[in-house]
Swiss-Prot record:
Gene3D superfamilies: Bira Bifunctional Protein, Domain 2, GAD-like domain, Nucleic acid-binding proteins
Catalyzed reactions per annotation: tRNA(Asp) + L-aspartate + ATP = L-aspartyl-tRNA(Asp) + AMP + diphosphate
Record has Aminoacyl-tRNA synthetase as a keyword: yes
Binding-site residues, L-aspartate: 171, 217, 448, 489
Family of the protein in this entry: Belongs to the class-II aminoacyl-tRNA synthetase family. Type 1 subfamily.
Key words, A-Z: Aminoacyl-tRNA synthetase, ATP-binding, Cytoplasm, Ligase, Nucleotide-binding, Protein biosynthesis
Compartment(s): Cytoplasm
An annotated GO cellular component: cytoplasm
Name recorded for this polypeptide: Aspartate--tRNA ligase
Any single GO BP term: aspartyl-tRNA aminoacylation
Length: 586
């Protein structure tokens, strides 16, 4: 039906006859001529219909946006004054001699010349996908997956598929469940990750595994999450955490070089503890140079504990942010920031405007001026390295509240004052996470998942002080986004049982949910490690997209619905009866 694609015709094709298929992007009727911008997935080309060729001209009068058409014509060079340097085909045009209208189109519910609301875009996704921005994102995504497969194949990894219908296991988020018709009252689960299967593959002797795989989590959504998502899943035997990180680092560097022509520097590495202390987050955006500065030792006197209304029985922290040249901030803006940190349970936000350092207390304007003396002020200025014209924001509270509040305020101020550097890439590894979290009842749960090995395979700390155990795990962060996470896995059956015991999984539940893994670990399981990288997030970053939906062909809304197909939906009662399922009203 066609000999060329619209976006691929160039000046070298002048006087050549072409056959094109595509859609009407825009129509302009100038009386003697009708100009049509014709579009396919490669781009646009201008087609001319002349009045003197009346038969085809008359047909062209019926054209409307998004009609699907076929055009035969001759490539000709545009006059210099009519050339369009904004498009790749701007030097040429097609003089049409045949027009076939393959299909008409209703008036569009979307306007490609302006922004459309998200619900309309998702409801008419088949039209939204015709836009060049979304189409370009999908092309880039295709190139990224090609590069990944090529890289992994060259590193001798095998692409192996794992089951989609699997067993429900406690992995953190809720499972999507699939009822079994053949086994009444029993359910499959859609995998949150291929975690257990890829470990089984290592036990099977598959030395190097990878897979670009769909995963499913029934969790609350946000701009960088979807209920079904794609991850680059990697597992390898006999490889240290350091070498896994090096492998992934080289893969990420290759993607950034090939897609963005950017040479990423060596990825820095910091511990979880350091990240929380300096940035208030285990996903720090290093494009923002502001760091949290601890001043607890400066305010250790009892009068300060009283002033800040701190409970001495709690794990407290006093810390601040130093904002360079921020003393110009208005009282209203400071009040706005106070309200902002209160969203994260901070009781109050204190501030100090440094007008003139040399004047001591006389040279500052502060909400804590009445408890400061020259010695304390000097220590604060030295610790924060603040200068004239700076502003300090201080919070005194429980450590986790201070970290969260100042961490979020750091990000907000970075954006508000243009401190966070755009068009810059700052990857880093976060390592040495705690092995377990403790809830208010004192119960422990895995920070990552219960198959993560303790650092240095330290059995004694698991036995005597599990709450102090450090895991041999690692997360990859780029510009504040968690791109991936992984760990060295437990390959010793007794240690695996020990971890299950620590997090409160009863023996009967261990056998019911993980019996196949426990049994497999008894047969010479090798040391192994792995990682999972979020493909959707990687594509989102590489395309400069604001939302993960813009890099997925058919995404869900933040309420996990598909507006195009109206799913999830009700099903026929007969189907439910076959599955022995009864609908209960809430």
């Amino acid at each position: 039906m066609r000999t060329k694609y619209c976006g691929n015709i160039r000046i070298s094709h002048v006087n050549k006859k072409v056959k094109l298929c595509g859609w009407v992007h825009k129509v302009r009727n100038l009386g003697q001529f009708i100009f049509v911008d014709m579009r396919d997935y490669t781009g646009l080309v201008q087609v001319i219909f002349e009045l003197k060729n009346y038969k085809i001209f008359k047909k062209a009068l019926n054209l409307r946006n998004e009609f699907c058409i076929q055009v035969f014509g001759t490539v000709q060079k545009r006059e210099k004054k009519n050339q369009n340097i904004k498009i790749r085909t701007g030097e040429i045009e097609i003089l049409a001699n045949v027009l076939n209208i393959l299909n008409t189109s209703k008036s569009l519910p979307l306007n490609f010349t302006q922004e459309n609301n998200d619900d309309s875009r998702l409801k008419y996704r088949y039209l939204d996908l015709r836009s060049f921005d979304i189409l370009e994102n999908l092309k880039i995504r295709n190139k990224i997956t090609y590069l990944i497969r090529n890289f992994m194949t060259k590193k001798n990894f095998l692409d192996i598929e794992t089951p989609i219908l699997t067993k429900s296991t406690p992995e953190g988020a809720r499972d999507y469940l699939v009822p079994s018709r053949n086994h009444y009252g029993k359910f499959y689960a859609l995998p949150q990750s291929p975690q257990l299967f890829k470990q089984i593959l290592m036990i099977s002797g598959i030395d190097r595994y990878y897979q670009i795989v769909k995963c499913f989590r029934d969790e609350d959504l946000r701009s960088d999450r979807q209920p079904e998502f794609t991850q680059i899943d990697i597992e390898v035997s006999f490889m240290s955490a350091k070498k896994i990180r090096n492998l992934v680092e080289n893969l990420i560097k290759k993607l950034w070089l090939e897609i963005r022509n950017i040479n990423l520097k060596k990825f820095p590495q910091i511990s979880f503890h350091e990240a929380m202390k300096k940035y208030g987050s285990d996903k720090p955006d290093l494009r923002n140079p502001i760091e949290i500065i601890d001043v607890s030792n400066i305010f250790k006197d009892k009068k300060f504990i009283s002033f800040f209304n701190l409970n001495p029985q709690k794990n407290n922290r006093i810390a601040l942010l130093c904002i360079s040249k921020g003393a110009h901030l208005s009282r209203k803006k400071i009040d706005d920031y106070t309200k902002y940190v209160q969203r994260f349970d901070a009781k109050k936000l204190f501030y100090m405007k440094i007008k003139e350092c040399k004047l001591g207390c006389l040279g500052i304007h502060s909400s804590i001026k009445n408890i400061l003396d020259e010695i304390i002020l000097k220590e604060i200025i030295e610790k924060s390295q603040s200068k004239n014209g700076d502003i300090l924001f201080l919070i005194a509270d429980q450590e986790h509240i201070v970290n969260k509040s100042l961490g979020m305020l750091r990000l907000k101020i970075g954006i508000d004052l243009n401190i966070t550097k755009k068009n810059r890439w700052e990857p880093l590894w976060i390592v040495n996470f705690p092995m377990f979290d403790k809830d208010i009842q004192g119960n422990l749960s895995s920070v990552h998942h219960p198959f993560t090995a303790v650092k240095n395979m330290d059995r004694e700390i698991l036995k005597n002080s599990p709450d102090l155990a450090i895991s041999d795990s690692y997360d990859l962060i780029i510009n504040g986004y968690e791109i991936g996470g992984g760990s060295v896995r437990i390959h010793d059956v007794n240690m695996q049982k020990q971890v299950f015991d620590i997090i409160g999984i009863k023996k009967s539940m261990q056998n019911e949910k993980f019996g196949f893994l426990i049994e497999a670990l008894k047969y010479g399981a090798p040391p192994h490690a792995g990682i999972a990288l979020g493909l959707d997030r990687i594509v989102m970053l590489l395309t400069n997209s604001k939302n993960i939906r813009d890099v997925i062909a058919f995404p869900k809304t933040t309420s996990a619905t598909c507006l195009m197909t109206n799913s999830p939906s009700t099903v026929d009662n007969l189907l439910l009866q076959e599955l022995a399922i009864k609908h209960l009203k809430k």
